[in-house]
Amino acid sequence: MTLNPSAKTAFKNNAWNKARIEAVGNSIRTWINGVPCANIWDDMTPVGFIALQVHAIGNAADEGKTVSWKDIRICTTDVERYQTPEAQAAPEVNLIANTISPNEAKEGWTLLWDGKTTDGWRGAKLSTSVSYTHLRAHETRRHL
């Protein structure tokens, strides 16, 4: 929530809160009481089950408290029809290595390097690209 301070105050203790979670493909977006909270791209768990969880209780005085959910709705068909527009999303975090999310691409971001060739590489003080003939491996030494 450090990227989204308004989300920190969205949850209301001792009251019903409305949560919206959109997990579509590698995109996970959340809202609490209409406030965008998280907008994450992550490919770690593309499939799985839905669970309602209460995290560990660290304070003995909190043991036995009641946690309740109501009016749970799950959409598995025609999902795109019910997705919230991008304009109502939290700041985006892309956790998928070496990719650009659709929103990042729309904003003009590109990968610096394709990870396979030297295309896109350039010397720090050069205006030209690097070729294979200029690459040289150096022995790695550890200093203990």
Predicted stretch roles:
Residues 1-136:
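Carbohydrate-interacting regions of secretory-pathway proteins
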Residues 134-137, 141-144:
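Single conserved hydrophobic/aromatic residue that forms the stacking wall/gate
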